[in-house]
């Protein structure tokens, strides 16, 4: 028993030391990896903004603002695009939780007149070969006379976008109607945010000219 009593404290001390060491290592790893991950995410967003917004010469990422449209519970991040000091449009980071596999995040660009310039899918977990075809499908010309390529759509005349199965004009991805509805939900959310920017857009344009 004497040997056991002398060994137990040593074991506890050893385990405690190991826990402290592991915690320290994890803290260092977290610190080392957090910055690169954040930087990679920022680069991806900057590239998406450039891909979907009208041509600009400012830094939309540095001028971003949070906007809570009427009827929504979550604010969306809005990136103003300016050219020669004039506001030319916005890139809006939108999302939906209605995907077949949950969350889909989309960057949607609009020009100052409310036309949808382009979109870029930032994140999704949709089924390969089905819902994962969102980027390709909604950049292709429709074969049915409906809407498929959403680029250039006058959203003032077209919104809200809905699939043909729901009485709308947008072609759903074959065998992936849920993913199609989810994508349009994200686009419509971005449009509602754009629509709520009227006063903000005027202020931004005025500030740009000063």
What does each of the following model-derived ranges do?
Residues 2-210:
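Flexible, solvent-exposed loop/hinge segments and secondary-structure transition points
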């Amino acid at each position: 028993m004497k040997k056991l009593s002398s060994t137990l404290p040593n074991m506890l001390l050893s385990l405690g030391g190991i826990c402290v060491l592991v915690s320290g290592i994890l803290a260092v790893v977290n610190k080392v990896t957090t910055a690169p991950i954040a930087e990679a995410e920022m680069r991806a967003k900057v590239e998406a903004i450039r891909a979907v917004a009208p041509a600009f010469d400012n830094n939309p990422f540095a001028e971003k603002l949070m906007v809570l449209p009427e009827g929504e519970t979550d604010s969306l991040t809005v990136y103003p695009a300016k050219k020669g000091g004039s506001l030319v449009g916005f890139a809006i980071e939108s999302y939906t939780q209605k995907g077949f596999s949950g969350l889909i995040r989309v960057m949607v660009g609009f020009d100052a007149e409310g036309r949808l310039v382009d979109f870029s899918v930032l994140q999704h977990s949709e089924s390969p070969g089905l819902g994962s075809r969102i980027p390709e499908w909604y950049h292709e010309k429709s074969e049915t006379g409906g809407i498929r390529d959403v680029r250039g759509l006058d959203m003032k005349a077209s919104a809200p976008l809905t699939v043909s199965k729901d009485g709308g004009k947008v072609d759903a991805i074959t065998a992936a109607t849920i993913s199609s509805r989810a994508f349009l939900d994200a686009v419509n959310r971005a449009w509602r945010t754009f629509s709520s920017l009227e006063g903000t857009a005027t202020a931004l344009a005025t500030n740009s000219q000063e």
